[in-house]
C-alpha cells in the first residue's frame, strides 16, 4: 500500500501547491511580460495593462460633470475639452503664416504644427505650398484693392489745387521740399490742363514741346491781362526769351490761379506789388493779396517769397541783376525737387556780383605766355567795402535797389 499512500501524499501535497501556484504563475507571467517588454514587447503589455488602469480609475470620483450630457470627468481640463465638442469652439489657431486651421485641443495643434516644422514631410510641403499660394493671393487682392482705392481717391484732391489757391502745404521759396520730379510733372500737367489735354493722359513725364507751345500761345493772347504794355513787355518778352521753361511754368501756374481770383485782386496788385514778407517766415501771415515772387508771374496768396530787394525784377528788369538768384528760387511755388530737370542753362556765369568789373588777365592769357615764371595766377583783389555800407540796407548789399524799406520795416507798416 505504499503506492496509494505515496499517491495520496503526493496528491495532498499537489493540492496546496496547485492552489498556491496560480498566483505564482500569474506573478511569473507578469515578470516574464516585464522582461519581454525590454525586448520590444511594450505595446502588447500596455494594451493589456490599460483595462486594469481604467478599472482602477473607474473607482475614482468624477466631480466634473458635463452640463450638456451625462458624462463626468476626473479633471477640469477634460471637462472643458469635452464641452468644446458640443459648442464647436476651436481656440487653438495655427500660427504658421498662411495657415488658417484651428483646433479645439492643444495636442491636435501640436500634432498639426509638426507638419509645418518637418521639411521632409510630403504633406507638410504640400501644405506649405498651399499656404504660400493662399497668402500670395490674399496679398494680391489687398494690393489691387488698395490700388483701386488710391486710384479712385487721387482725382478729387487734385481739383482744388488746380482751380484755386487755398492755404495749402506749398513750401516757402527758400525751402525746396525733397519731392520727386514725377510729382512736379504731375502738378504741372494739372495746371496746364485747360490748354494741353493730351498731356493729362500721360502716365509719367511731360511733353516739353507741348507745354512750350501751349504757354506761348496763351502768352500772346492774354499777355495784357495782368500788366500794362510796357510792364508786360519787360516781364514777358525778355524774360521768356532768356529764361525759357521756368517762366513758362510760372505763367502756367499764374494763369490757373488767376482764374479763381476776381478783378479786384488783379487791380489791387498795383498798390501791393512791392509788399514783401519777413525773411524767416515759412508761410505768409498777411491777407491773401496777390504778391508776386522773384521769377514767377502768379499771385500766390498762400505764401510770399523772401525779401530780395537787390534782385527784384520789377526794379530793373533789363539789368543783369536778374541772374543773382539761382533758378530754383522761382521754381518753388509748388512741389519741386532740389534740382529740377527742366531747369534751363543760365546765360552767364556772373552769379556773384555783376557790378564788379573784370580785373586782371584771363586764364587763357596766362597760359599762353611764353615764360614759365609769368604763368601764375594773380592774387585775387577783394573789394574794399566799408562796414557802414555793409550794415546799411541801401548800401553795398542793395546796389540796384531803389527802395530801402522793403526788407522788413516798411512792408510791415503797410500790412498792418
From Swiss-Prot:
Zinc fingers, C2H2-type, are found at 64-86, 92-116
Where in the sequence does UniProt note compositional bias of the Low complexity kind? Answer: 279-293, 395-409
Locate the region Disordered. 1-21, 145-179, 220-321, 340-368, 395-416
Q: Tell me the Gene Ontology biological-process terms attached to this UniProt entry.
A: chromatin remodeling; negative regulation of DNA-templated transcription; pentose-phosphate shunt, oxidative branch; regulation of carbon utilization
Q: Which cysteines are joined by disulfide bonds?
A: none
Where does it mainly reside?
Answer: nucleus
**GO CC annotations, alphabetized:** cytoplasm; nucleus
| UniProt feature, compositional bias: Basic residues | 230-242
Q: State the post-translational modifications.
A: Ubiquitinated. Deubiquitinated by creB, probably to control its activity or amount.
Note the InterPro entries from the entry: creA/MIG_C2H2-ZnF (IPR051007), Znf_C2H2_sf (IPR036236), Znf_C2H2_type (IPR013087)
PROSITE patterns associated with the record: ZINC_FINGER_C2H2_1 (PS00028), ZINC_FINGER_C2H2_2 (PS50157)
> Do the record's keywords include Kinase?
no
Is the keyword Ribosomal protein in the record?
A: no
The record's subcellular location field reads: Nucleus
Keywords recorded for this protein, A-Z: DNA-binding, Metal-binding, Nucleus, Repeat, Repressor, Transcription, Transcription regulation, Ubl conjugation, Zinc, Zinc-finger
An example molecular function term from Gene Ontology annotations:
RNA polymerase II cis-regulatory region sequence-specific DNA binding
List the Pfam families.
zf-C2H2
Q: What induces it?
A: Induced during growth on suberin.
Q: How does it assemble?
A: Interacts with creB.
Q: What does this protein do?
A: Transcription regulator component of the regulatory network controlling carbon source utilization through ubiquitination and deubiquitination involving creA, creB, creC, creD and acrB. Represses the transcription of the alcR, alcA and aldA genes by binding to a GC-rich region in their promoter. Also plays a role in response to carbon starvation and the control of extracellular proteases activity.
Could you tell me which PANTHER family the record lists for this protein? REGULATORY PROTEIN MIG1-RELATED
Homology family = Belongs to the creA/MIG C2H2-type zinc-finger protein family.
What is the protein named?
DNA-binding protein creA
